[in-house]
Amino acid sequence: MSEIRKPLLGFVHKLQDANASGSSGKTHCPTCLRLFKVPRLLPCLHTVCTTCLEKLDPFSVVDIRGGDSDTSSEGSVFQDPELCSLQPQIGILCPVCDAQVDLPLGGVKALTVDHLAMNDVLLENLRGEGQGLVCDLCSDREVEKRCQTCKANLCHFCCQAHRRQKKTTYHTMVDLKDLKGYSQVGKPILCPSHPAEELRLFCELCDRPVCRDCVVGEHREHPYDFTSNVIHKHGDSVRELLRDTQPHVEALEDALAQIKSVNNALQERVEAVAADVRTFSEGYIKAIEEHRDKLLQQLDDIRIQRETALQLQKAQLEQLLADMRTGVEFTEHLLTSGSDLEILITKGVVVERLRKLNKVEYSARPGVNHKICFSPQEKAGQCQGYEVYGAINTQEVDPAQCVLQGEDLHRAREKQTASFTLFCKDASGQSMGRGGDNVHVEVVPKDKKDSPIRTVVQDNKDGSYRVSYTPKEPGIYTVWVCIREQHVQGSPFNVTVRRKHRPHPGVFHCCTFCSSGGQKAARCACGGTMPGGYLGCGHGHKGHPGRPHWSCCGKFIEKSECSFTSGQGAPRSLLRTVAL
């Protein structure tokens, strides 16, 4: 059953009016305010008289759908499957919560009858000395007694006739005044397909109550059992849904309390900042007064903007809380006050409603905060030719706009301090220009996630933060950089930690001949040689790389790590060159 809401702020007033009705909502129609007459249960679990529902204007023709559409009403357990063909979908608005209700193919009269409400109405009439109750048999005279066996209300004449009949001679008759202490005096619920038969059985295949004639006809060969035998299984499933729904009520109440707290803090902060603005503006006469008024207007705009956001979230959560409460209260009332058959009849629409409520997503945190501050030393331009100071600061860091930079961002050495810089920016990409943000950094080895490395975050007070750490072992590390529990741009990322830097044991030279002083036995890792018995390289000779290089490994970069390994089997003359 799909539901479409009208604007939420308009719903809040209707919701308050509906809640103000109190306990009379169990016996009185919310539309006509009279005792229920043939009450129908809507998918939103609100009950309205059949006649009142029929007077409502159709909301719209929604679409063309088949019987398996999720917008079709499952309110009536007696809906004919053959009617589930393509037909126009008509909707009405619930007069209590403004939810759009897609009517079943049979219209309003195909909605589920709220037998629980009918029982409450009957009890209400009994407590009022039976005024307004007419005989169930003749429908002409006022009720005097009730047959506990037939569950029928009878006038004096029909009561005497009831006793004279052989089949009903020994039925128990009770005066209406003796029924005032009863909590349930409902009438027998008859099968709509076989009005002479009472619904006492439950078809497991069709998931609906049936009578004796149904199980030998339409439901022949379907598994069925007495309602008293299956109520435990189906009642437990409804109770499980109820238990899943109840925590949402508490969560929504806590969320509304937080919104109220934030709203109060916002008001206090606005007043405090306004006081600062007024104090600062006293020394500047007209120019400062004009500047003050501009600041107050800006502050008020911020207040209105944030209050509107809070009120909208508050209205949404209040509406959702009302829906949750309606579902919980109705289900609790059904499970505690309803008969086995009443629970089974109403089970379908209750289960559908509770499932949908449990799937609704909502944020338990306020959508805005009360962070507003006044910066009196900040330049605000000129006002009437005067240089004025003071500005309202609502700038907040946006983790998605923050930037990570540094040579050691993706590489590091074991037992050597590595560092990088975090530049904080707001949503527009502007630098924060100030510190104080809650920056959280974690450096964790990929193969030892339970052993994070100690990190140091230095606040530079200009919107940038220097992060440093010292890895103890080589390997792949994962770095997390978060602000307000949100990853910054590029986080998380991996860092490759190499072994400690290996210095060059050789010399950085132009050639072996020059660095060794002309020794013939001196060699070089570049592999160059010279004629005349020289084993090392020389300018312009075979194998010389043409530029300065390291004699130990042949690398061309002076500030680099030596790649020479003992397994290369370097000749002794190479080491002699190193010594020279």
From Swiss-Prot:
Indicate which residues the UniProt annotation says bind Zn(2+) 2. 191, 194, 214, 219
Q: Which residues form a coiled coil?
A: 249-329
GO-annotated cellular components: cytosol; intercellular bridge; nucleoplasm
- Annotated B box-type zinc fingers sit at 130-176, 186-227
Q: Where in the cell is it found?
A: Cytoplasm; Nucleus
Keywords attached to this Swiss-Prot or TrEMBL record, sorted alphabetically, are: Coiled coil, Cytoplasm, Metal-binding, Nucleus, Repeat, Transferase, Ubl conjugation pathway, Zinc, Zinc-finger
Which positions bind Zn(2+) 1?
135, 138, 158, 162
Its EC top class is transferase
Q: What happens when the gene is disrupted?
A: Deletion mutant mice show earlier onset of death and exhibit higher mortality in response to lethal challenge with LPS. The production of TNF-alpha, IL-6, and IL-1beta is also significantly up-regulated after TLR challenge.
Question: Start-end of the Filamin repeats?
Answer: 394-497
Disulfide feature: none
Q: Which GO terms describe its molecular function?
A: ubiquitin protein ligase activity; zinc ion binding
Question: Which reaction is recorded as catalysed by this protein?
Answer: S-ubiquitinyl-[E2 ubiquitin-conjugating enzyme]-L-cysteine + [acceptor protein]-L-lysine = [E2 ubiquitin-conjugating enzyme]-L-cysteine + N(6)-ubiquitinyl-[acceptor protein]-L-lysine
Q: Which domain of life is it from?
A: Eukaryota
Function, as annotated: E3 ubiquitin-protein ligase that plays a role in the regulation of inflammatory response. Mechanistically, mediates the 'Lys-48'-linked polyubiquitination of TAB2, a regulatory protein of the kinase TAK1, leading to its degradation via the proteasomal pathway and inhibition of the TLR-mediated inflammatory immune response. May act as a transcriptional repressor in mitogen-activated protein kinase signaling pathway.
Q: What is this protein called?
A: E3 ubiquitin-protein ligase TRIM45
Q: What is the lineage of its organism?
A: Eukaryota, Metazoa, Chordata, Craniata, Vertebrata
